[in-house]
Amino acid sequence: MEKFKYKYLIKCGTNLFNRIGTCEVHSQIISEVLVRSSFCGHDSHGLQRFTEYKKLFEDKKISANGKITKKIVDNRMFVNGGNNWGIVVANEVINELIDLSNKHSICSALIKNCNHIGRLGEYISKPAMQKKICLAFVNSYDSNRKKVVPWLGVEGKLTPTPIGFGCPSGYKWPLMIDITTSAMPEGKIRDYMFNNKRLPEKCIVDKYGKFTNDPNKLYDDSNGAILPLGGIFGHKGYALTILIEILAGGLTSSGYVNEKNNKQGNGVFFIIIDIEKFINYEEFIYRTKSFIKYIKKTKTRENDKVLLPGEPEHNLFMQNKKNGIKISKRVLKNLEEVNFFI
């Protein structure tokens, strides 16, 4: 199977979005984020999203010329994304929030009217590379994406909500936690479907509440749903989902998943903490590296190796950037149908 190079795929993606009416700069930003996700091993937020984003744009769910407005009050930034590309909005906001954090110990940004922002790791890593800690909470206020069951339920009422944490590690890679509070991200389940694979046990249920490992059950007329994170302790993942809905849906005024507003996108809540305003940075890094070394010395099973959150993505990205990546037949076919390749 053919392997595709990093810069080539970014060029193809930039051309696709530019061709449908997005400016060159924004087209490249979106393309870089999506391609980087696949090269980090997260296809659920990678190449498969090109065709999805194109359709959203053509269905007028995204406004490439939507005005992004910001209001800064002390250490808080209030953002209206103007229904613009979510990746463009989030990228712009995180960069400006980093600048704002140079003046404040802790600062935050609340974003509404923002389309899908892609992989959280893209944003939480930036402050982490600049001596800062970042927290991120994202909800989806699209009532059509209610695919996650509340604890003990069998009916999709919630959406897969991610939570993120980025922090300097003292190594070439930042510590990064980017997880969804459902058993699996919806996009990851789509990956299994595209590759004709069975899901791990007890990730989704059918409309009768019975466990199934058939990913198609989430998308066909059977009205399947994803279980909350945690397995038999799923009440914990469910509780985190409620927390994220409150912060990213309520506090930002984006709206909760039950509000039928005929919109599609994300409510986003970013927090950046300037480490140097709390503790000497070198001391923080020294102690953090010592902690990481302590974790890495854990005894393991044969051929296993303890890694820290964010380390696998860094290693895989460097490997894939050198060698290129393969694209599944289903995603490749979808990309060819929209004339992605140049």
Cite the ranges covered by each PLM segment.
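Catalytic-core signal marking the mid-to-C-terminal active-site face
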Residues: 4, 9, 19, 246, ...
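Phosphate/diphosphate-binding glycine-rich loops and adjacent basic-rich segments that engage nucleotide
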Residues: 143-218
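Active-site cofactor/substrate anionic-group-binding motifs, chiefly glycine-
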Residues: 46-98
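Secondary-shell segments that build the walls of catalytic and ion/ligand-binding clefts
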Residues: 194-258
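Glycine-rich phosphate/pyrophosphate-binding loops
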Residues: 131-147, 244-262
